[in-house]
Amino acid sequence: MARPLGRVAALLLGLLMECTEAKKHCWYFEGLYPTYYICRSYEDCCGSRCCVRALSIQRLWYFWFLLMMGVLFCCGAGFFIRRRMYPPPLIEEPTFNVSYTRQPPNPAPGAQQMGPPYYTDPGGPGMNPVGNTMAMAFQVQPNSPHGGTTYPPPPSYCNTPPPPYEQVVKDK
C-alpha cells in the first residue's frame, strides 16, 4: 500500500510541477484595475487577453543581426575572391598623340605676327598664313614620332575671347 501511495504522490507532484511551469501569468491594465490571464510557456503575452505563439529565435535580435552580417561578409568575400581569380581583362587604350611645336620667339620686340597661335608640323617649317588660319589649325601631322594614328590639333578658337553679351542677346 505504501508503494502505490508513493507513486500517486509522485505523479501528482509531477503534474503540479508541469502545470505551474507550463504557464505564463500575464496581466494588463483595463481602466484602473489590472486584469490577469494565463498563457502557455511557448506563447507570449500580447496585451488584452491574447497569447501569441512565437519561437524564441524570433525574439533574439542579435542572432538575426549576426546572421545578416555573416551573409554580407560571405558575399563580400566571394566577390573579392572571384575578382582575384578572374581579373577583368586590361583594355589597352590607344596612345594619345599631342605632339606640336611652339611658335619661335619674336625676333624683334615690337614686331608681332598677325593671327592666332597655331600648331605646326614637327617635320616641316612653321608658317602662319594669315588668310588661311583654319587650314593651318586642322593640319594633320604625318611625321608623328609615335607612329600611331595621328589626330588634328585642336582648333584655334580656343585662344580667342568670347563675344560680348550684347551681341549674343542681339543674335537670338
Curated annotation (Swiss-Prot):
Region (Disordered): 139-172
Record's keyword annotation contains Iron-sulfur: no
Membrane topology value: Single-pass type I membrane protein; Single-pass membrane protein
Molecular function terms from GO: enzyme binding
Residue intervals on the Cytoplasmic side: 82-172
Location in the cell: Cytoplasmic vesicle membrane; Late endosome membrane; Lysosome membrane
Extracellular-side positions: 23-60
UniProt keyword list: Cytoplasmic vesicle, Endosome, Lysosome, Membrane, Signal, Transcription, Transcription regulation, Transmembrane, Transmembrane helix
InterPro entries listed in its UniProt record: VOPP1
Residues of the signal peptide: 1-22
Membrane-crossing residue ranges in chain numbering: 61-81
GO cellular component: cytoplasmic vesicle membrane; late endosome; late endosome membrane; lysosomal membrane; lysosome; organelle membrane
Biased composition (Pro residues): 151-165
Subunit-level organization: Interacts with WWOX (via WW domain).
Entry similarity comment: Belongs to the VOPP1/ECOP family.
PANTHER family in UniProt: VESICULAR, OVEREXPRESSED IN CANCER, PROSURVIVAL PROTEIN 1
Job description of the protein: Increases the transcriptional activity of NFKB1 by facilitating its nuclear translocation, DNA-binding and associated apoptotic response, when overexpressed. May sequester WWOX in lysosomal vesicles and thereby regulate WWOX role as tumor suppressor.
Protein name per Swiss-Prot or TrEMBL: WW domain binding protein VOPP1
The species this protein was found in: Rattus norvegicus (Rat)
Taxonomic classification: Eukaryota, Metazoa, Chordata, Craniata, Vertebrata
